[in-house]
Amino acid sequence: MKLPHELGPIHFIGIGGIGMSGIAEVLINLGYSVQGSDAAENANVLRLRRKGAIIHIGHRADNLGDAEVVVVSTAIKRNNPELAYARELRLPVVRRAEMLAELMRLKQCVAIAGTHGKTTTTSLVATLLEAGGFDPTVINGGIINAYGTNSRLGAGDWMVVEADESDGTFLKLPADVAIITNIDPEHLDHFGTFENIRKAFRSFVENIPFYGFAVMCLDHPTVQELVGQIEDRRVITYGENPHADVRLVDIDLAGGMSRFSVVVRDRKSGGETVIEKILMPMPGLHNALNATAAIAVAHQLGMSPDQIRGALAGFGGVKRRFTRTGEWNGAIVFDDYAHHPVEIAAVLKAARASTKGRVIAIVQPHRYTRLHSLFNEFAACFNDADAVIVADVYPAGEAPIEGADRDGLVAAIKARGHRLAMPLARPADLSRLVRQLARPGDYIVLLGAGNITQWAYALPGELAASAA
């Protein structure tokens, strides 16, 4: 039985979240009655209201109204008054991933998983399939600039979704095609150990049907190890690795663009298809690899090299992924969501390759537990930045952990030989510090998953005002 159209109002608790809002928007577009609540208004709430959703600010039992189904994310606590009342009424309570899975059962699905790069890769797959005439439905974990939203309802048979591994619920998703970009230690608060993370990703791949396939990055050692463990399912590998089925070659990352070619090897015939002179307006080796994963899917679905080249040349990017927010005195300011050491290092490497000037990194560590568990990795991930400014940790509701803080990270970065790392005493000091450091041609990159994005958009104006 598939998701019936006769459902009464579907109530989302925390509807403004990036994952919840995308599912809610697709349900609205399918004709379902959607309502919800959130702790505060945001752009997602306003967008859903414009589409007809009734959304309350604050959580109260009477917000449920005539709801017949309640959708919650793992961020919602058991004592939430709406959740408690729903259970008192014996209403069905559905986890976010379960509702996503119900939508996926209506289509053939590509699900993109990995510790990093999911959102960009999801956007790239969506862009390619749209250009190929597949008219896909898309549910992403970030705002796709071309859509102005994180979801779209297509009339075609395919759906493209970001598979969030953070709470393990990605194992509920019925994917026909699975992409794994990488596997690194993350979300240890849920998984406990890295071994448990590896096991979860193996299950994710093994869950695909026999007629599906997995696309896996051979450049990443943990993913490469997993490739060797998968039996009885079709695997297509990609990367710079010379043994990859879909190989990234001839890479030029200068000038804020990615130029490369891709060689697709047919295992049965031994023949090769070369997709030459691909240009993508997005910098960084990590993004070229994300594009290669998307190309692997597009090629399998029969898209031509010209279709692939055209789609990637017009790729509009994803909000908060190396997003330019402004310029001051010839220095360019960027906003990026990177909040894990691997992500930060990749973004700074891309910045280094894109400018002849210097790279100034401003980081707001996200969660004390993450900084504590990956402290040595954080201390070593800023090598491509000429200067590092470290803000206070964005707690995301967590209690402080001794030593895992702003000053501790600054000291650790310096101890590993970095010549210019400094603390940010308060956000109001940021423009003054940047004015002292920045020169024409420099890239100023603000990094983090907290409210540092607001600083990134305010900084160009503050720099201009302080210069007046």
From Swiss-Prot:
Which amino acid positions bind ATP, per UniProt? 114-120
Sorted UniProt keywords: ATP-binding, Cell cycle, Cell division, Cell shape, Cell wall biogenesis/degradation, Cytoplasm, Ligase, Nucleotide-binding, Peptidoglycan synthesis
Listed GO molecular functions? ATP binding; UDP-N-acetylmuramate-L-alanine ligase activity
Tell me where it resides: Cytoplasm
Q: Which GO terms describe its biological process?
A: cell division; cell wall organization; peptidoglycan biosynthetic process; regulation of cell shape
Q: Which reaction does it catalyse?
A: UDP-N-acetyl-alpha-D-muramate + L-alanine + ATP = UDP-N-acetyl-alpha-D-muramoyl-L-alanine + ADP + phosphate + H(+)
Q: One GO cellular component from the entry?
A: cytoplasm
**What pathway, per the record?**
Cell wall biogenesis; peptidoglycan biosynthesis
User: InterPro entries annotated for this entry?
Assistant: Mur-like_cat_sf, Mur_ligase_C, Mur_ligase_C_dom_sf, Mur_ligase_cen, Mur_ligase_N, MurCDEF_pg_biosynth, UDP-N-AcMur_Ala_ligase_MurC
Major subcellular site: cytoplasm
This entry's Enzyme Commission designation comes to 6.3.2.8
Q: Which domain of life is it from?
A: Bacteria
| Function per UniProt | Cell wall formation.
Annotated PANTHER family: UDP-N-ACETYLMURAMATE--L-ALANINE LIGASE, UDP-N-ACETYLMURAMATE--L-ALANINE LIGASE-RELATED
Family, according to the entry, reads as follows:
Belongs to the MurCDEF family.
- Kindly provide the name given to this protein in its UniProt entry: UDP-N-acetylmuramate--L-alanine ligase
| Organism field | Methylocella silvestris (strain DSM 15510 / CIP 108128 / LMG 27833 / NCIMB 13906 / BL2)
Gene from which the chain derives: murC
